[in-house]
């Protein structure tokens, strides 16, 4: 049955307009994005299939074009639309960080990092460069690694910090395993970066580890 044949109160778009987006399930929100289903499946049915295949929204957002387009009814145009929505959300969060003290805004920082890193299949190391008032100057993905590790070079991090004339930096990387727990190597790397940047008067404010559904702060754990 097509969604247009459903009772008006049960249609995702009408429910959102009446009650707000928080009232809808993940499948209903995704169905509004999809707009239409395929033969024999409503947009909600198709949304549920996508969420099941990719193990939720996080997996769906991290899916590459090849995997996404293997789902019947999904093609390059829909993939591009999804990526555009994600990028707009990421940029909106980055705008918020640029206009406020990042250390006074832990919520937006975490949200930005989760949107940028959670669900990625390989480790990615990100640096957020800040000015003297802890406002974001730039965010850069500096290194990419394998499923279990990333090679990070302090010299390159220092060069990028000097390029941006940064006064401070926040680091982040993801754990594809899903566990937001620091390894011994993570702790050693953080201290190495801190010492290297200290030589050029750049402060390391925090290092976040992004796992599945969780983000750990080195500063909050007393590890910086």
Curated annotation (Swiss-Prot):
One GO term of the biological process aspect = proteolysis
InterPro entries hit by this protein: MPN, RadC_JAB, RuvA_2-like, UPF0758, UPF0758_CS, UPF0758_N
**Residues in MPN domain copies:** 102-224
Coiled coil ranges: none
Q: Which UniProt keywords apply?
A: Hydrolase, Metal-binding, Metalloprotease, Protease, Zinc
Q: Does the keyword Cytoplasm apply?
A: no
- Read off the CDD domains from this record: MPN_DUF2466
Binding-site list for Zn(2+): 173, 175, 186
> What GO molecular functions are on record for this protein?
metal ion binding; metallopeptidase activity
- UniProt motif JAMM motif: location: 173-186
List the Gene3D superfamilies. Cytidine Deaminase, domain 2
Family affiliation: Belongs to the UPF0758 family.
Q: Which NCBIfam families match?
A: PRK00024.1, radc
Q: Which PANTHER family match?
A: DNA REPAIR PROTEIN RADC, UPF0758 PROTEIN YEES-RELATED
Query: What protein name is recorded for this chain?
Result: UPF0758 protein Nmul_A2138
**Species for this entry:** Nitrosospira multiformis (strain ATCC 25196 / NCIMB 11849 / C 71)
